[in-house]
From Swiss-Prot:
Organism the protein comes from: Plasmodium vivax (strain Salvador I)
SUPFAM superfamilies, per database record: Class II aaRS and biotin synthetases
The EC number(s) this enzyme carries: 6.1.1.20
UniProt keyword Membrane present: no
Gene Ontology biological-process annotations: phenylalanyl-tRNA aminoacylation; protein heterotetramerization
Protein name: Phenylalanine--tRNA ligase alpha subunit
Reaction equations catalysed: tRNA(Phe) + L-phenylalanine + ATP = L-phenylalanyl-tRNA(Phe) + AMP + diphosphate + H(+)
GO terms for cellular component: cytoplasm; cytosol; phenylalanine-tRNA ligase complex
Pfam families listed in its UniProt record: tRNA-synt_2d (PF01409)
Compartments (UniProt record): Cytoplasm, Cytosol
NCBIfam families documented for this protein: pheS, PRK04172.1
Family: Belongs to the class-II aminoacyl-tRNA synthetase family. Phe-tRNA synthetase alpha subunit type 2 subfamily.
Regulation: Inhibited by bicyclic azetidine BRD1389, which competes for L-phenylalanine.
Applied value in biotechnology: The identification of residues that recognize the inhibitor lays a foundation for the development of drugs against Plasmodium species as well as related apicomplexan parasites that infect humans since they are conserved among apicomplexan alpha subunits.
Amino acid sequence: MQAKAQEEQKGEELSQFLQALEEEFALCQEGGGDKREADGPSLENAEAEELANRRAYYLQLKEERNVLVEESKHVTSLHMSSKHNIEHAKVLGMAKKLETLYYVVNHVRSFNTYQLTEEGKEYLRDGSPEHVTLRYVMEQEGCTLEDLKKLFGKKGEIGLNINLKKKKIELRKSDKRLFPHVEGSAHSLVDETRCYLQKVEAHGNDEGALVSHLKGILPPEKGEKKEEDEANNLIKELKKRKLIEAKKISYIYIIRTNLFTKEIKKQITDLTYLLIKNEEYKKYQVKKYNFFSSGKKMNKGNIHLLIRQMRTFKDVFVSLGFEEMNTHNYVESSFWCFDALYIPQQHPSRDLQDTFFIKVPEMCQEEFTDQSYIENVKRVHSVGDYGSFGWNYQWELKSTKKNVLRTHTTANSCRALFQLAKEYQKTGSIIPKKFFSIDRVFRNENLDSTHLAEFHQVEGLIIDRNLGLSHLIGTLSAFYKYIGISKLRFKPTFNPYTEPSMEVYGYHEENKKWLEVGNSGIFRPEMLRAMGFPPEVSVIAWGLSLERPTMIKYSIRNIRDLFGYRSVI
């Protein structure tokens, strides 16, 4: 019963609103007053692009629904609200309802109103700090900084800074005394800021009138456009000083169409036998079928977000000419995961708190790679070689044979490079190559909203002769541009197996801040020469996680939500 009563009340209010609209449209027809009023800008003052879009919409209504827009008959929602004592929100709601019936067409408009803040009211009442301080300095014919601060406090500091900036007061450095640098007497001074605030208080409800009055008291400029710009800059300055605050007022122009009527027939969706027999259907409006609306999308069978992002990265790498590496082995020996990458055996990353060590089998097989390569790695770690001093410690074969869950896919990069080194030793030629991989890695880390014990690493590398830092930066710029990050910054960092090394930061447009999006560098000679490559061969490489760009792209706050049913809804 209560719902029915509310519905009847809404119907009655809508009928009264229609009657009021009819009266206003009639006044427009008779020329009895312009209902655009001074509360907002004229409808005809719209930009050319907006006007063109509006005309196109009117033409579409005429062709598709036989609706003719009567542009000369219009009224604003603000006028309807004030004249007929209806809440503005209700006017907006009823106008939108009528637009769905094509009785009217609505155009949303907005303008700013300005009012004084508490600080602005204080300045209007007591005078602005810049005027008060300048007047005091002129009356005293000079004073000290201490006198000014003691007498006016914080207000004195504000006024002094403004006057020093405008060069109306000079500070003599020898004795810290202040002197006026303006002509005339203290009594002839005009408080300009106070004058501006008076205009805001008087005309703040009408942005156009406020700009016009401010132009009247500002120094004359050459050209109407410059004067208006000066007035707008002054308003911005007052807002910046928090002396005034702006409030955006949104309203609509309600424009009549040829379908407008003072009564609304109740809509029905079905014609029944009784409605036709009793001819009651004439009281109602039969709702038309909408053959263009889409049904509700069923959330099933969706591709996982990480798989979707992984495919995107693969497409980028392939388009840039990269080949995918074999990364199927989740379990690696410490040799490939650490030692071959010139990471010392006492490095913190090889501790239990960072790495998952395998219990069974604890050690890898005896002949896990060429013995000569193992000896080269042992020598460069223990005593150094290839121009390096090494790490100078007792290298142990037992430690390098321990099995681990790989902590990075760079271990697979190392395997791929070693195969190329063996081909070079056979043929004596270096064929430039580009490799990439995207696969899981494992870290013994505490779980939180941004860290997981397992995640995906995206890695790319290029091998060629005499590659340098400029090649790396150029490649990174091209790669990240493909994935939608065009603004990059590079920061020096340290990696055991690359030198030089760089962290890559990308600018996130939505969050308006720089985020770390990867790590990069040039593989060290201690790593490449031990494999058997000649000195002129270089390898540039970079890596990033798959999860972070996925979280940014799909606005996911908790990394754990990437796994499970939530990630496909």
